[in-house]
């Protein structure tokens, strides 16, 4: 894990190495979940590129997520510091009890370990999320991995899951599958 001082950082928190929120995985190959730092932007970008069918955003967008939205995002790294998992999202300004999960990516080496769920739960159990009682995301109808993840989260959190069409193919330029808005909640973050 490479953490350096970022001279532009308004907060001393960003200048410190990130402490792992959780250590997951097997004893022989642990994974560390923590808030992202500016040094993680390119690694996040590369991870998402390696995880089709995820939409790849610009490296700049991932740098912004790693700095401006770091309290609502998480990365998972292996012992070598390689980013093998990422979750991004934000608390909605018009609904401060709702976290909108934008993207979850898990690299091939870490798939099948429950890392996606652990990344989401690492974010949801942070003190910054104490007032959050709903999680929203969008999922294409055929993304079975994402549907499975969010159904498992709803079951674990003992919360209802509802969905409805949100963005049509036409709204997405005709080249993208429609996106359903999925909502889990209400739930209590202190019971996750």
UniProtKB/Swiss-Prot annotation:
Gene3D superfamilies: 3.40.630.30. Optimum temperature is 20 degrees Celsius. Keywords: Acyltransferase, Transferase. Disulfide bonds: none annotated. Its EC number is 2.3.1.178. Optimum pH is 8.2. GO terms for molecular function: diaminobutyrate acetyltransferase activity. CDD domains: NAT_SF. Residues 31-192 form the N-acetyltransferase domain. Pathway: Amine and polyamine biosynthesis; ectoine biosynthesis; L-ectoine from L-aspartate 4-semialdehyde: step 2/3. GO terms for biological process: ectoine biosynthetic process. Belongs to the acetyltransferase family. EctA subfamily. Does not acetylate amino acids like GABA, L-ornithine, L-lysine and L-aspartate. This is L-2,4-diaminobutyric acid acetyltransferase. It comes from Halomonas elongata (strain ATCC 33173 / DSM 2581 / NBRC 15536 / NCIMB 2198 / 1H9).
